[in-house]
Amino acid sequence: MALVSADSRIAELLTELHQLIKQTQEERSRSEHNLVNIQKTHERMQTENKISPYYRTKLRGLYTTAKADAEAECNILRKALDKIAEIKSLLEERRIAAKIAGLYNDSEPPRKTMRRGVLMTLLQQSAMTLPLWIGKPGDKPPPLCGAIPASGDYVAKPGDKVAARVKAVEGDEQWILAEVVSYSHATNKYEVDDIDEEGKERHTLSRRRIIPLPQWKANPETDPEALFQKEQLVLALYPQTTCFYRALIHTPPQRPQDDYSVLFEDTSYADGYSPPLNVAQRYVVACKEPKKK
């Protein structure tokens, strides 16, 4: 029943989102007329080579209207973004519910492990669809935006993706990409699934062995302070794997859609670092260990 209810709510939200998109276009069409008037007024002023009281008053009115139009369009877009966030949240809840139902349904045969190529594609899609933080003027980026860590009392929710420090088969420790199953306030420990094993490899880990992944991309053009900076030590997901390794930031993103360029620690190279490789904001987190000398 819960899945049916979620489907119904998602359908409602999609209808509301469609209406908001139509409103955005209508608002934009209305504002275009005013913007054309502003441009024409400036052209007349240049032709006459003077700023008369008439033009000054006219421009003030036109710009006031343009500002109000832009704010109205911005408000509609923010409402649309809220709808998208709610839809994504419901889809995630539905995925988790289906996963739990599958785990406890003995009448169905066990699922086959996901093909590696499919998993890598899903990880890329997750990075691409990570929402960009768009704050109002004066707003500071929140925790889990880009390089900003979670607050000290933050508890990751079931379904959240994290970097988890686990013991490998050989006895060494490594950071893996994992999904939170649950958190116990009594023991202060997480249960997480190795993302590469689809729930077959479950780990119970203390909070200090868990690093929540970013929930928003930071915009380099408006919030550069929310990004890791050049030569900063991080843990980054090595391309085409599900493991995090130590790396130095080579180049931070310059535009919202850009990835980090990082140098992974690699003793097979003379300087101890790999050539630059691209890693999405979604899969770069702080490394608390010191740099290797």
Swiss-Prot record:
InterPro entries: SGF29, SGF29_tudor-like_dom, Tudor_SGF29_rpt1, Tudor_SGF29_rpt2. It holds the Pfam family SGF29_Tudor. Widely expressed with highest levels in testis. Highly expressed in hepatoma and other tumor cell lines. Residues 194-196, 240-243 are annotated as: Histone H3K4me3 N-terminus binding. Keywords: Acetylation, Chromatin regulator, Coiled coil, Nucleus, Transcription, Transcription regulation. Residues 264-266 are annotated as: Histone H3K4me3 binding. CDD domains: Tudor_SGF29_rpt1, Tudor_SGF29_rpt2. Residues 152-293 form the SGF29 C-terminal domain. The modification N6-acetyllysine is found at K288. One of its GO terms (cellular component) is ATAC complex. One of its GO terms (molecular function) is methylated histone binding. It comes from the Eukaryota. It is found in: Nucleus. PROSITE patterns: SGF29_C. Residues 3-88 form a coiled coil. One of its GO terms (biological process) is transcription initiation-coupled chromatin remodeling. Its main location: nucleus. The record marks Y238, Y245 as: Histone H3K4me3 binding. Gene3D superfamilies: 2.30.30.140. Interacts with dimethylated and trimethylated 'Lys-4' of histone H3 (H3K4me2 and H3K4me3), with a preference for the trimethylated form (H3K4me3). Component of some SAGA-type complexes. Component of the ADA2A-containing complex (ATAC), composed of KAT14, KAT2A, TADA2L, TADA3L, ZZ3, MBIP, WDR5, YEATS2, CCDC101 and DR1. Interacts with (methylated) CGAS. Interacts with TADA3L, GCN5L2, SUPT3H and MYC. The SGF29 C-terminal (also named tudor-like) domain mediates binding to methylated 'Lys-4' of histone H3 (H3K4me). Chromatin reader component of some histone acetyltransferase (HAT) SAGA-type complexes like the TFTC-HAT, ATAC or STAGA complexes. SGF29 specifically recognizes and binds methylated 'Lys-4' of histone H3 (H3K4me), with a preference for trimethylated form (H3K4me3). In the SAGA-type complexes, SGF29 is required to recruit complexes to H3K4me. Involved in the response to endoplasmic reticulum (ER) stress by recruiting the SAGA complex to H3K4me, thereby promoting histone H3 acetylation and cell survival. Belongs to the SGF29 family. This is SAGA-associated factor 29. It comes from Rattus norvegicus (Rat).
